[in-house]
Amino acid sequence: MLPGVGSDIADPDQTEMAYVQTPVVCLLSLDSALRELTLYLHDVTMPLLLMNAPQDHVVPPSNSEILATAARGPVERVSLDRSYHVATLDYDRSLIEEKVVDFAERVTKG
């Protein structure tokens, strides 16, 4: 077991429920799945909305660059500059809601 990862939130008034420990087998499974998934990123042709926090302490922000570069559809990026990993509970939560609703409305217009 490894120490758990949780509450990577800039807003001190917010907390996230998280496991105290992370089983190593879960991380190995995730790594294996991500390696396989990466082989198919070039098949993504639909519009993408990628949001990431430059100060994320859990997932490197560069991971979104991998997807943005590999995907063949249009990519819209939003930087969540005031938040950490759990951005939906953090300072940028209203921005996330606004951008997701706007994106969904635009891409579903027929």
Outline where the language-model segments fall.
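Short alpha-helix in the alpha/beta-hydrolase fold that links the catalytic acid
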Residues: 46, 60-69
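Catalytic active-site module of serine/aspartate enzymes centered on a nucleophile-bearing elbow/loop
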Residues: 76, 81-110
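Hydrophobic anchor at the start of a short beta-strand
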Residues: 48, 75
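Active-site rim beta-loop-alpha module in soluble metabolic enzymes
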Residues: 14-17, 46
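Active-site nucleophile elbow and catalytic-triad environment of alpha/beta-hydrolase enzymes
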Residues: 23-40
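Short beta-strand/loop motif that positions the catalytic acidic residue
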Residues: 43-44, 50-52, 56
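Helix-rich cap/lid subdomain of alpha/beta-hydrolase
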Residues: 1-14
